[in-house]
Amino acid sequence: MGTVRERAIKRVAYKLVKQYPDLWTEDFEHNKMILSQIAEIKSKVYRNRIAGYITRLKVRERQGTLV
């Protein structure tokens, strides 16, 4: 079974992907860097979880399984 993420992480990730659709890629390190530039997130753990979920959303978008 996969990791269940907090609702707040999902909410922020969906909002950022919708607001800046062309900035994100399937590369976690790239997404982490972009997230640091456009959002002021003080917690490194929180930033990494959001970047990881955005990465997962982009992979699902490519595979055609994103609803």
Curated annotation (Swiss-Prot):
Gene3D superfamilies on file: Ribosomal protein S17e-like
GO terms classed as biological process: translation
Claim: Ribosomal protein is one of the keywords in the record: yes
UniProt-recorded Gene Ontology molecular function terms: structural constituent of ribosome
Any one Gene Ontology cellular component term annotated for this protein: ribosome
HAMAP family (alphabetical): Ribosomal_eS17
PANTHER family named among the record's database cross-references: 40S RIBOSOMAL PROTEIN S17
Family membership noted in the UniProt record: Belongs to the eukaryotic ribosomal protein eS17 family.
Name this protein carries in UniProt: Small ribosomal subunit protein eS17
Lineage: Archaea, Thermoproteota, Candidatus Korarchaeia, Candidatus Korarchaeales, Candidatus Korarchaeaceae
Protein encoded by which gene: rps17e
